[in-house]
Amino acid sequence: MDNKRYGHFDDQHREYVITDPKTPWPWINYLGNEDFFSLISNTAGGYSFYKDAKFRRITRYRYNNVPMDNGGRYFYINDNGCVWNPGWKPCKTPLDFYECRHGMSYTRITGCKNGVEASVLFFVPLKTLAEVQKLTLKNTTGEVKKLKLFSFEEWCLWNAATDMENFQRNFSTGEVEIEGSTIYHKTEYRERRNHYAFYHVNTEIQGYDTDRETFIGLYNEFANPDAVMEGKPRNSHAHGWSPIASHYIEVELKPGEEKDFIFLLGYVENEQDKKFVAPKVINKEKAYAIIEKLNTTEKVDKAFAELCQYWDALLNIYNVRTGNDKLDRMVNIWNQYQCMVTFNFSRSASFFESGVGRGMGFRDSNQDLVGFVHQIPPRARQRIIDIASTQFPDGGCYHQYQPLTKRGNNDIGGGFNDDPCWLIFGTVAYIKETGDFSILDEMVPFDNQPGSEVTLFEHLKISMDHVIKNLGPHMLPLIGRADWNDCLNLNCFSWDPNESFQTTENVSEGTKAESLMIAGLFVVTGKDYVALCNKIEELKNGKIENFNSSTLKSFNFSTEAARMQQAVDAMIDAVKKHGWDGEWYLRAYDFYGRKIGSNECDEAKIFIESQGWCTMAEIGAEDGMVAKSLDSCKKYLECEHGMVLNNPAFSKYIYEYGEISSYPEGYKENAGIFCHNNPWVIIGECLAGRGNDAWSHYAKILPSYVEEKYQTLHKVEPYVNCQMVAGKDAFRPGEGKNSWLTGTAAWMWYTVSEFILGIKPDYDGIRIDPCLPETASDYTVSRKFREAEYEITIHPNGAQKGIKQIVLDGKAIDGAIIPYSAGKHVVEVTM
């Protein structure tokens, strides 16, 4: 397949530049950093929402539509009968020039046609509940241009799920108000809702439309709205049906003249007793304040500069210079940016996730923390509290929670037995980054129930105990509904296509099927828990000022560390005895006690998840198990585009295994390349000192390398990781799916920053422990850590692993940890 190119990286401006609107799939970006968010494609498709893409959807979007990516924030330009859009869609009029620049929380789309240049800057200003759309029109001809400009947004009726189904109600609820150049969407505001949205432009308008059928025409499309094609607004007022917001502006441009138009899509919540200023007239005071804040080009430019400065600061916390542009751009820009997005959205809203079916995942959000905690630690801290608040008293937890309410999702429930361990993983990462042990003293409820509060540390303790209390016949962890692999449903037994694999239970009640993946995870997080307990005991004597809880002050952390170490040792013994297949670790035992992921199996003889976690746990390393497992990954799982999840693929549905065997060969969990778990094996390679293999695996799924070789085949955005790449058994190996919202982002960051480049936050400072390919050159990492700034230069000298000497501020130090102290420091590391 020819590798047609649709764009390129612009590292200086931290942008990806798309030069052809007809990308193989919509290539999107995310706007907003907190509360107000938007998804925007390279042709301005997408939608906006407040906090929760399900319950506070502001604008409408139709997934899997024909044509693809139809609907968004559109500007129609009628130039003497020639109608076009700056982003090509929806009219798809051929443009003389097109460019989309996706940057850090902003997108700029530029189109030119017949001597008119239209450029739109889209962004959400910091701490503002509005999306700015700054449209600049420029006349590049020697003649006067008279243009008819139409804006367009289609309102969603708030709940994105019922918006797509409850039409017997929806067609009768839509309400709007029009005041000057602002169109207000107030559907259902009269009753239980206290929120509305608005669409404003900072100039006088010559007309408007708020009824979709009137504006477009019942049998027309976004590509040919009646009002636009005829150049005449209808001044329609929506009463039910489908409300929209469209401004009509007559624009005259002299030769060489350009004009700015500031459009604002905003969201407002009012206090219950301040909803109206007169009967049926909404209180617009907060909307006026947003408009006043952003009603001129100068104000918008200032807000945009502040956003850019915000990202400058975030991306200067960790910066590497290796001389390898492909590596540097991913580490310094796009990987960290994607980590922010996954932290904000978990797996809820992308062009593959509709924002309706999933909220914030317990497992997902804890993993996302390791890619984000260095950027904004206070937000990471609050996220940990929110996650722990959805835990149950027995240590189990809701699998997901809604971002708007922060309450557990009853539709999914719990019973995914890996979930509790991830709370230790996320919390330890936070404390190592910040040194803030006081988080362990926070009083956190169970299931968000008032009066049930215990310290966060007690939540960690019962998380570990949940695994210990749920062991199977081989003393390995029970899998429950599933472990990390939501599609390995060993207690489901479903023949009914109308039921969910994840939520269907059979009579076994999950008391037999066991997971080697959870076993490895338990050992890794158990070691972290033991080290945390020992560190607390070391610091307890007056050195942790904020430990106010009598429970924690009187708790014997040394005894707890010893207790948990025994449990970890027992798990290691169980894995060695019952989890080793000769060349690799087993994946699981099914309900009947049969091996899964064994050479004895007809298909799916080896799985990546247990190889990753058991090698990360270094189980049996002294007996050669880790090395054999890693060799088996390379021999049986690796292919041109990464490592597949299992091999060979399932060729038929096996009801004892569940959803995993329902996929065609090479896709998703059935031998697809799940990019999320490739880093687990890479970390195992790093811990084993195998830098050449670690780098080889890493580069295969690094977007900048994929972009260079497989831009057309890969299909999805070339600047971020995707969840899944079609495996070697697929019809089209190398094709990507499920981009953006994937744990791959955090794991790629964690892997490269801490294990390959080797800069690891620790309780007492920064641990230096790189694992590099033999070809690696000298490199420098600038790392802000708490109140310190470190300039760390690594001299590999051809070594893959091992430190000969560390020189801190001109003096050699013992050990591999740079002791923390505030201020600026220069570090030289010789391998």
Task: Specify the residue positions occupied by each region the protein language model found.
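Anionic coordination/interaction segments
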Residues: 1-364, 378, 383-386, 429-433, ...
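Aromatic-rich carbohydrate-recognition surfaces in CAZymes
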Residues: 78, 360, 364-365, 369-380, ...
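Active-site lining segments that contact anionic ligands and/or coordinate catalytic metals
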Residues: 104-106, 244-248, 258, 609-611, ...
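Catalytic cores of carbohydrate-active enzymes
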Residues: 150-152, 167, 398-400, 521-548, ...
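Conserved hydrophobic/aromatic pocket- or pore-lining residues that grip, position, or stack substrates
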Residues: 334, 368, 614
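Solvent-exposed loop and edge beta-strand segments that line ligand/cofactor-binding
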Residues: 350-365, 408-417, 501-519, 594-617, ...
